[in-house]
């Protein structure tokens, strides 16, 4: 039942540095150590917020050339909200897709005018979190289990993983681009906290529908169509 409603991202990699971090992380969990040191992974509650703050500062230093993209379920942490506000004031373009609770008001002149917030609620309950800092060759991309909430950053064990593979980054950028183009389920947050439906474009584009079509096309390439009942059920979904 859950699998029919929820979507998320997972990552399988042979990257040695990430593997070493993951091994150390689970060893630390086994002995109750929440203060481990990790080189590639972002790990809460001990260091994730500090490292995210440093990544935002990295973009602030670029001024108007800086860029941040965040896909989250929620953002409520005051420290990170303040840091994103600082980024906006420095001219950094901050693009956020926040499905649920969002405690930062975008497009407030002199404060958050460079922040744009969109919410997409559709057939599937999306749980993927994506963080991108910078663009093109300078981009640092992460997938994560953590929202920008105090409970995630300070009171839970959470992990963010860097994405180095060009092929995987391309797939994630495909998700981001489709959600940018969504004009059927997307709602844009205004400076007063209300939401307005996105109506750009002449043709209706639903990000979730497009991604489902991508998945079906990939399945057709990797496995030929069959008469098995499970395949027919999948086609009817």
Model-inferred region functions:
Residues 22:
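Core active-site phosphate/anionic-ligand binding loop and the adjoining beta-turn-alpha structural block
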Residues 1-19, 29-36, 42-237:
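PLD/PLD-like phosphodiesterase catalytic module centered on the HKD motif
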């Amino acid at each position: 039942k859950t699998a029919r409603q929820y979507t998320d991202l997972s990552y399988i990699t042979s990257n040695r540095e990430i593997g070493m971090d993951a091994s150390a992380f689970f060893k630390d969990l086994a002995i109750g150590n929440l203060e481990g040191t990790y080189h590639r992974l972002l790990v809460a509650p001990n260091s994730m917020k500090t490292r995210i703050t440093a990544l935002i500062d990295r973009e602030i230093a670029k001024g108007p050339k800086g860029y941040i993209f965040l896909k989250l379920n929620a953002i409520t942490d005051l420290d990170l909200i303040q840091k994103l506000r600082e980024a906006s004031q420095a001219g950094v373009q901050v693009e956020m897709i926040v499905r649920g609770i969002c405690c930062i008001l975008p497009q407030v002149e002199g404060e958050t005018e460079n922040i744009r917030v969109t919410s997409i609620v559709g057939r599937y309950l999306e749980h993927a979190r994506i963080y991108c800092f910078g663009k093109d060759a300078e981009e640092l991309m992460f997938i994560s289990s953590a929202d920008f909430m105090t409970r995630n950053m300070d009171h839970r064990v959470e992990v963010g993983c860097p994405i180095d593979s060009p092929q995987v980054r391309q797939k994630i950028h495909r998700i981001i681009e489709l959600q940018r183009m969504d004009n059927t389920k997307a709602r844009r947050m205004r400076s007063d906290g209300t939401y307005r439906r996105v109506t750009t474009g002449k043709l209706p584009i639903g990000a979730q529908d497009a991604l489902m079509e991508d998945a079906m096309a990939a399945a057709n390439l990797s496995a030929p169509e069959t008469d098995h009942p499970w395949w027919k059920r999948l086609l009817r979904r």
